[in-house]
């Protein structure tokens, strides 16, 4: 926690990037494990909460004031098409769970990879100061890469 506050207040980009990267890896792993559970759509509220928390912590690490509004605006700014693609991906993830064992494994991978894509976009925008349009392209590109 001391490292986080130091990086936040000094706006030390390398420290912020390191901490955000650690958050990204941790949340992606946790979401991947949550996505392994075999009941379709039961993990969706947990995943959404974890992903929102991850984005909020990345915003906090960047030194900006955190609030549900800012996180919501960022998620909305990624684009309606990205949200629709994410929703379709979640639907496919739920459907594939009906395949014993492998369905849950693929679902866990997609949950972790989707969280990773969202976190990379948040880091690009809030830590690296990447323009919003470029951040959208990065997010969409990462989502296209993960085909279950």
Task: Annotate the PLM regions.
Residues 24-61, 65-120:
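Membrane-inserting effector segments that mediate pore formation, membrane fusion
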Residues 8, 12, 16, 63-67, ...:
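Juxtamembrane loop-helix boundary motifs flanking transmembrane segments in multi-pass membrane proteins
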Residues 119-148:
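Hydrophobic alpha-helical transmembrane segments of membrane transport and translocation systems
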Residues 19, 113, 134:
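Charged, alpha-helix-enriched surfaces in structured cytosolic catalytic cores
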Residues 2-5, 32, 36, 130, ...:
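Residue-level signal for secondary-structure boundary elements
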Residues 1-25:
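C-terminal end of P-loop GTPase domains and the immediately downstream helical coupling element
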């Amino acid at each position: 926690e001391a490292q986080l506050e130091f990086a936040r207040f000094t706006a030390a980009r390398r420290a912020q990037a390191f901490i955000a990267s650690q958050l990204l890896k941790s949340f992606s792993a946790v979401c991947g494990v949550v996505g392994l559970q075999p009941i379709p759509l039961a993990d969706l509220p947990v995943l959404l909460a974890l992903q929102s928390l991850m984005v909020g912590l990345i915003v906090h690490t960047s030194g900006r004031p955190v609030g549900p509004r800012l996180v919501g605006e960022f998620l909305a700014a990624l684009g309606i098409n990205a949200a629709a693609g994410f929703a379709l991906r979640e639907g496919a993830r739920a459907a594939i769970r009906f395949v014993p064992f492998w369905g849950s494994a693929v679902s866990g991978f997609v949950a972790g990879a989707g969280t990773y894509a969202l976190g990379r976009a948040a880091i690009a925008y809030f830590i690296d100061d990447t323009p919003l349009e470029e951040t959208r392209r990065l997010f969409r590109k990462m989502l296209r890469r993960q085909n279950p």
